[in-house]
Amino acid sequence: MKIIHISDLHLNTYFKNSHLEEIKFILNFIAKENFDHLIISGDLTDNADSQDFEILRDLFKRKDLLRGDRLSLMIGNHDVYGGIVTPNDIFTFHEKCEKINYHLRLNEFYLYFFETFENCAYRNDYYPYAKKFGDLLIVAMNSVMPYSKVRNPFASNGSVNLEQYNEVIKILEEFSSVKRKLIFTHHHFNKIKSLRTGGLYNVWNNIEKQTIKLKKKKRLFNMLRKYNVDLVLHGHYHKSEEYYRKGIRFLNAGATIKDSPRKTIRINIIEISKEKISVDIKKLDLNSHRGVYYPVNKTITGPEYPRIILQ
């Protein structure tokens, strides 16, 4: 089975550098690949804006990806709380987060892409859910933590609450006979370093990097080892790499677009056979692999947001 893994698309059509061109390029490239399933591990949007979700839904539909057997999605912290769009947002972000209904945002994300949540072997509300493909089990585990002034002041920390943790265990026990087990979530499990450059935006990034930790990792490590999970996919930290921690294999797709060199795309390709799971982090030059893009017209529908219409 061939799985393509991408993450952190951060679509934001408020800005000229919206990542829309890169996302269309990625989907065109994927469409030409002989793949079985696509996994996107969170932060599909940058600011949780409704028009960005609508654009992504349309792009997925055009590529026949709005199907549970073709696409699995994870919500990211930016899909719930958004992020820092302008320098002034640094001073108003906390107030914005306090007004957001976490559970409502989970429901809205589900409704935008509800077709991809169908044909599950297990699903309770939104997360966790599981899909079974022959001798492969894919489990989706939500790590986005509700906003808290004390425990999650920048809405970027992660946590898997006890209820969901127990449900994941239930899934792994119910499908214990399945040979290959893959879990995907949004938050990373590795340690990261701070930026040394200056500037207000990078100061914010350094603050955020100190508050993007996945809490209570110890019990997650124990669970992953106990149930012999073969591979854990994630994003959040904008780096594409394969690594091991506590004897567990991880694959990050956080630099699919973000923090990659200009016009460079990174796509994780996973090949699963009876004998092994192989991983290839494919680097693509956007300029030398250009495909056919959808025509895009921009029209203004309000005082703040340009509306992008796909024809």
For the regions a language model picked out, list residue spans one by one.
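N-terminal active-site segment of His-dependent metallophosphoesterases
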Residues: 1-58
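Binuclear metal-dependent phosphoesterase catalytic core
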Residues: 132, 240-311
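Active-site-proximal beta-strand elements of phosphoester/diester hydrolases
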Residues: 1-13, 135-149, 184, 249-255
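Active-site environment of divalent metal-dependent phosphoester hydrolases
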Residues: 10-15, 45-50, 74-88, 127, ...
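Active-site neighborhood of phospho(di)ester-bond hydrolases with catalytic His/Asp-centered motifs
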Residues: 5-7, 38-43, 70-77, 142, ...
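Extended active-site neighborhood of metal-dependent phosphoesterases/phosphodiesterases
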Residues: 55-167, 175, 225, 269
